Amino acid sequence: MDEKDLATQPEEAGQDPRLPGPHEDPRRQERAEAQAKKGPLAPDAQGKRLGQGPPKAGGRLLSLKGDRAFQRLRKGRAGRGRFVSVKWLPAPEARVGIVVSKKVGKAVVRNKVKRRLREILRRLHLPKAHILLVASPEAREAGFAELFQDVVRALRKSGLIQ
């Protein structure tokens, strides 16, 4: 690198020329606020916004473990949506099991659906219960907002949330 390539003006102290300044795009904050108002997090009947709950267990959901836990859930209360079906039983702590069969697609697609369902459940105010979510093959085509609304609908039908 030659000396002629270097800037001749000294940089102002504390400013990085690679980072945009706050003055460069005045509409940036407006667009971010407008985008935050949209989406599946609309208020419910009581005016409480779904999805605004604190994350569970430091942001992670506790998983259902073992065959027995899944077998017990067969006797639980059920609800069905377009993309998921839900079964649940009251329990001393909130635990979640997510089932995505190979009918949904290859591993990458199944993992994407599982990540979305985990994130949706993490955002909801869930009571203490063991919950089983079973994704239908149509879940692979659903966007996050559609999946969110469908999970809420199925949980309401099952009686887990109001």
Curated annotation (Swiss-Prot):
SUPFAM superfamilies: Ribosomal protein S5 domain 2-like (SSF54211)
EC identifiers of the protein: 3.1.26.5
Keywords: Endonuclease, Hydrolase, Nuclease, RNA-binding, tRNA processing
GO cellular component: ribonuclease P complex
Gene3D superfamilies, alphabetized: 3.30.230.10
A GO biological-process term: tRNA 5'-leader removal
The UniProt record lists the keyword Cell membrane: no
MF terms in GO: 3'-tRNA processing endoribonuclease activity; ribonuclease P activity; tRNA binding
Residue intervals passing through the bilayer: none
UniProt region (Disordered), positions on chain: 1-62
Domain of life: Bacteria
Reactions catalysed: Endonucleolytic cleavage of RNA, removing 5'-extranucleotides from tRNA precursor
Pfam family, one: Ribonuclease_P
Function: RNaseP catalyzes the removal of the 5'-leader sequence from pre-tRNA to produce the mature 5'-terminus. It can also cleave other RNA substrates such as 4.5S RNA. The protein component plays an auxiliary but essential role in vivo by binding to the 5'-leader sequence and broadening the substrate specificity of the ribozyme.
Quaternary context: Consists of a catalytic RNA component (M1 or rnpB) and a protein subunit.
Miscellaneous section: The open reading frame (ORF) for this protein entirely encompasses the ORF for the 50S ribosomal protein L34 (rpmH). The two start codons are separated by four nucleotides.
PANTHER family xref list: RIBONUCLEASE P PROTEIN COMPONENT
HAMAP family: RNase_P (MF_00227)
Protein name: Ribonuclease P protein component
Gene symbol of the encoding locus: rnpA
